[in-house]
Regions:
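Sec-dependent N-terminal signal peptides
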Residues: 4-16
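Acidic/histidine-rich, surface-exposed loop or edge segments in extracytoplasmic proteins
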Residues: 20-25, 80, 113-119
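A secondary-structure boundary/capping signal
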Residues: 78-79, 96
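Active-site His/Glu-centered metal-binding helix of metallohydrolases
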Residues: 96-105, 130, 134
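Catalytic Zn2+-binding segment of zinc metalloproteases
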Residues: 82-83, 90-91, 99-115, 142-144
């Protein structure tokens, strides 16, 4: 009797594990499909001809994706840790647009983009801002709301004390530049802001008062200077 019970428990555990694995595979397949469709829409809408592949990998696949020989630098890898912050398709488009921008830039220039890739590594702050702006353009052309880039970054990039010796810009600086870019080039989205009641957008408004005040002064004075956001 004891052997029978032990055997049944083992079988039940095996079956439950099988169902769990099936559920995980189905979930990954659905997420991958969503990422592929969103990525394809962005690339088609922006007439991007360079090949870029999208890969959804859970944390346990991270090392494999980095080391596999058939994985190139032109693959956009979306980890579960990134995807969990995506609240809607606009935010997914925000994430993918930035990564596509960086991947496409790696094709530019001589030596099949090798020099450009080295430049990006040498000036990460500069290209971080460039990618943010290109992402806004990509999103608008693909009929996505670029304000979602603000809400996504607000959630995923904690503010640091300073960026003097960092390879990344302060989050507040990035968001201020994105806001100014949208304000200047795509004012429709701010005038008809569907994210106005979004808690993360409200958080941005609260923490960006000084930077937005600088922008208002710039507009008031009809200035063309590049503001030194903090």
């Amino acid at each position: 009797m004891k052997k029978f019970l032990v055997t049944m428990l083992f079988l039940l555990t095996f079956v439950n594990t099988g169902f769990a694995n099936d559920g995980t595979l189905l979930y990954e397949k659905n997420v991958q499909n969503q990422i592929d469709l969103c990525g394809a829409k962005i690339m088609n809408s922006n007439q991007i001809k360079e090949p870029v592949v999208f890969v959804y990998g859970l944390n346990e696949k991270k090392n494999y994706l980095k080391s596999a020989q058939n994985v190139t630098s032109r693959q956009v890898i979306v980890y579960a840790n990134d995807y969990k912050y995506v609240s809607d398709e606009n935010e997914l488009a925000a994430f993918l647009s930035r990564e596509i921008a960086l991947a496409v830039r790696s094709y530019d220039g001589i030596f099949k983009g090798m020099l450009r890739s080295l430049q990006m590594k040498a000036s990460p702050k500069k290209f971080e801002i460039v990618a943010d702006k290109i992402a806004v353009d990509y999103m608008v052309k693909a009929d996505y709301n670029p304000i979602a880039l603000i809400t996504f970054i607000q959630k995923t990039s904690p503010q640091k004390r300073y960026d003097t010796i960092s390879t990344k810009n302060l989050t507040s600086k990035r968001l201020a530049i994105i806001y100014e870019y949208i304000y200047t080039k795509y004012p429709y989205y701010l005038a008809n802001n569907t994210y106005i009641n979004n808690e993360f957008y409200q958080r941005f408004l609260l923490t960006s008062q000084n930077n937005r005040r600088l922008l208002q002064e710039k507009i008031k004075n009809n200035s063309k200077e590049n503001l030194k956001y903090e």
